[in-house]
Amino acid sequence: MTDETKLTYADAGVDIDAGNAMVEAIKPLVRATRRRGADAEIGGFGGLFDLKAAGFTDPILVAANDGVGTKVRIAIETGAHDTIGIDLVAMCVNDLIVQGAEPLFFLDYYASGKLDGAAAAAVVKGIANGCIEAGAALIGGETAEMPGLYAGADYDLAGFAVGAVERGALLPRSDIAAGDVLLGLASSGAHSNGFSLIRKIVAAQKLGWDAPAPYAPGQSLGAALLTPTRIYVKTLLPLLRAQAGIKGLAHITGGGFPDNLPRVLPQGLGVEVDLSAIAVPPVFAWLAEAGHVSAAEMLRTFNCGVGMALICAEADAGALLASLRAAGEQPVALGRVTPAGAERVTYSGRLSL
């Protein structure tokens, strides 16, 4: 083989220079996420975090990882890449806060068939914005260019978050009991779950992402569906630190109430949810009608308007509701903890679909 015919990595579809240029471009975004314990510099073999500098005394580390499911397909097809990274952070850090943990640092994985530096940088910008909102340092990541595994401009994301909680403050507490109150915090929409069903409904309706959103005047359907997942850390962390009476938290993701509420309940206990208390966002009413989706299927697929659930003693509910309102939330009294029956999650009232 002559010098003229020798192959290079670039000939195989991997552009090392493009990857290095992207890393340089995102360094200012990453630095903006620095916090106590991390300088948020990237480029080394691993990210560093000084747990002592973060102020913990007897901490337990909590780790979570997640993705954004097929919501990423909408970002790819619309070319709107700047908020999907917020979703990625939210899905991970919300799983930390429900265990009482303060998010400390975050790492991401971005995989594509051919690296689009501008798209990747926009994704990382969203990740950095999510990290800032969650108070987590973005201390590292991996950008993988893998020709033959992803078609065209397709990419996928994974996130990894680590937090810490003092040993005595771990959630859920062991004293959750029948009669405790269930509170709900509003979601911003579908968050990052159920998008395979959403995309199927959109296709059946023969709608494009640039079509007007049937449920959101003034927005395109793609933009409305890309509304980022809420990050609940800034609301909940001060209340946890203040020992405001939160006994348990549940992040309402895939599986809805039936799958997620039992994860924080002791054996022998269930919960009754008052569906009429939920202010259901218009997106869910549209999905239910357009897709002929039953209320039961909606409840086991989507958050239906409640992205985070809290459990507290009845005596603490009034003060906790007031604190949540002072933090800018619109909490609802969602139900009560009950002795478990045949189904651990039961319902009263009806969803406003």
Curated annotation (Swiss-Prot):
**Protein's recorded name:** Phosphoribosylformylglycinamidine cyclo-ligase
Give the record's GO biological process terms.
'de novo' IMP biosynthetic process; adenine biosynthetic process
Give GO terms: molecular function aspect only: ATP binding; phosphoribosylamine-glycine ligase activity; phosphoribosylformylglycinamidine cyclo-ligase activity
Q: Which organism is it from?
A: Methylocella silvestris (strain DSM 15510 / CIP 108128 / LMG 27833 / NCIMB 13906 / BL2)
User: Main localisation, per the record?
Assistant: cytoplasm
Quote the cellular component terms of the Gene Ontology held in the record.
cytosol
Q: Which domain of life is it from?
A: Bacteria
Q: Where does this protein reside within or beyond the cell?
A: Cytoplasm
Q: Which family does it belong to?
A: Belongs to the AIR synthase family.
HAMAP family under this entry? AIRS
PANTHER family named in the record: TRIFUNCTIONAL PURINE BIOSYNTHETIC PROTEIN ADENOSINE-3 (PTHR10520:SF12), TRIFUNCTIONAL PURINE BIOSYNTHETIC PROTEIN ADENOSINE-3-RELATED (PTHR10520)
Q: Report the catalytic activity.
A: 2-formamido-N(1)-(5-O-phospho-beta-D-ribosyl)acetamidine + ATP = 5-amino-1-(5-phospho-beta-D-ribosyl)imidazole + ADP + phosphate + H(+)
- Extract the InterPro entries matched here: PurM-like_C_dom, PurM-like_C_sf, PurM-like_N, PurM-like_N_sf, PurM_cligase
Known pathway = Purine metabolism; IMP biosynthesis via de novo pathway; 5-amino-1-(5-phospho-D-ribosyl)imidazole from N(2)-formyl-N(1)-(5-phospho-D-ribosyl)glycinamide: step 2/2
- UniProt keyword annotations, A-Z: ATP-binding, Cytoplasm, Ligase, Nucleotide-binding, Purine biosynthesis
EC code:
6.3.3.1
